[in-house]
Design a protein with these regions (language model features):
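Zn2+-dependent metallopeptidase catalytic core
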Residues: 95-107, 173-187
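Conserved oxyanion/phosphate-binding beta-strand-loop segments in alpha/beta enzyme cores
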Residues: 99-100, 105, 111-168, 267
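Extracellular/periplasmic catalytic domains that process cell-envelope and extracellular macromolecules
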Residues: 53-57, 89-92, 113-116, 131-135, ...
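Structural recognition of the beta-strand scaffold that forms the well-ordered cores
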Residues: 138-142, 161-166, 180, 197-199, ...
Length: 399
């Protein structure tokens, strides 16, 4: 990327940070401390007054009440030798009820939890984000019935699975801008989001970013029967009994885990079929053989360009997803969607002019091998030429 283009990119980052309030924290300040055990939240009079004030702000207020007001439990664990990171385990679902309030009006009420009928279940999600911000943990929401929390005019947007992203996702507009860039550059699905205030068991928890989750679905990642969604995951070690397999190319502390088929439903035959396909692709990649029959190279180029535009400094690749739409020999491995932007746009100190994936000692995605191939470089250049003049105009309307 030439110096002029680099300066354009940096100016774009500065502009986004300025309009987002210079990176100031937008989260609530009066957050309770959390434990790794189940506790009961007891709202105070001050909490009740603050909830009334939150109802008047105009943003949707998500009031979640768990059965018996039990906090969703979790335990923090440290990576074993040879692995990396912090994450949470024992993060089991708690039955709950959700009431959505906007402008002092109740616009939605799930009712109490009844399996497949009403309510939802809530659990703590995430890795570092779940550990580093006590009182403002991220959550996964699993509804008994499909719902579109973003109120769009297509029933296909309805889904049971949603997430509430905490700080740093909720502190500025970087995640919103990054998803807009992902949609524009990749010409494919990226999660839709919106800011919401969250009250859990009567206690205000601050500002969150409501987001669609990465999963199979007609309006998400439509892989269908016979297809798969994989994540190359540095946190595989937190669930060693789950199905997984290593890569021949990626850093050894990462392994492929399954997003679809679900780890509870996947068969040994499916695991073998999927891993064999990946290994055939990796062998061809490592030995300089043609890879076009295995991979949609344009999607890999777009994935890398997204992170170069964002200046991603995440050494683990910011959640690397792959998908294949069916079991037919004609369908190809695709890279994406992009996810996790806590290391983007200057949030992590980084002096490189590219994303961290260009570093020669860091194999993020398959970039180290792909950059040796003319066909990949051609696709990367084509993608840049297609998008370079429309990035700002595309992103601004979504902020």
């Amino acid at each position: 990327m030439c110096s002029i283009q680099f300066l354009q990119r940096k100016c774009f980052f500065v502009f986004l940070l300025c309009i987002s309030g210079g990176g100031h924290d937008l989260c609530g300040q009066n957050l309770i401390a959390e434990d790794t055990l189940s506790v009961t939240a007891i709202p105070s009079v001050a909490d009740s007054l603050l909830v009334e004030q939150l109802c008047e702000l105009g943003l949707p207020l998500y009031s979640i009440t768990t059965q018996n007001r039990v906090e969703p439990p979790y335990t923090v664990v440290v990576a074993p030798s040879g692995c990396c990171g912090l994450t949470v385990v024992d993060n089991i679902y708690q039955p709950a009820r959700l009431v959505i309030i906007q402008n002092n009006d109740t616009v939605y009420d799930t009712g109490d939890y009844v399996a497949n009928t009403s309510g939802l279940r809530v659990k703590v999600r995430g890795n570092t984000s779940a550990v580093g911000f006590p009182g403002h943990t991220p959550y996964k929401l699993k509804f008994s019935k499909k719902i579109d929390l973003l109120h769009r005019d297509d029933k296909n947007y309805k889904d049971k699975n949603w997430v509430l992203l905490n700080y740093p996702a909720s502190r500025d507009f970087v995640h919103i801008a990054a998803n807009a860039i992902g949609r524009y550059v990749r010409e494919d699905w990226q999660p839709a989001t919106r800011f919401v205030n969250v009250v859990l068991n009567g206690v205000p928890r601050g500002l969150y970013l409501l987001s669609e989750s990465v999963k199979d679905g007609e309006c998400r990642v439509p892989v269908g029967n016979g297809g798969f969604i994989l994540e190359d995951d540095p946190y595989w070690w937190s669930a060693e009994e789950a199905p997984m397999f290593p890569s021949k190319v990626f850093n050894p502390y990462m392994k492929f885990t399954f997003k679809y088929p679900d780890e509870d439903d996947i068969t040994e035959e499916q695991i073998n079929s999927i891993s064999n396909f990946i290994y055939e692709f990796e062998d061809a990649l490592l030995h300089g053989e043609p890879i076009e029959k295995y991979a949609d190279i344009a999607t890999f180029a777009a994935w890398m360009l997204c992170h170069d535009i964002l200046g991603t400094a995440d050494s683990a690749g910011s959640n690397i997803y792959f998908s294949k739409k069916d079991s037919l020999a004609t369908s190809k491995l695709q890279a994406g969607p992009i996810w996790d932007f806590s290391g983007c746009m200057g949030k992590v100190p980084f002096k490189g002019e590219w994303s961290y994936s260009h570093y020669p000692d860091n194999y993020v995605n398959y970039n180290g091998e792909l950059l040796k191939r003319d066909e990949f470089l051609i696709e990367y250049a084509k993608c840049w030429e297609r998008v370079k003049n429309g990035i700002v105009e595309t992103v601004l309307p979504e902020l």
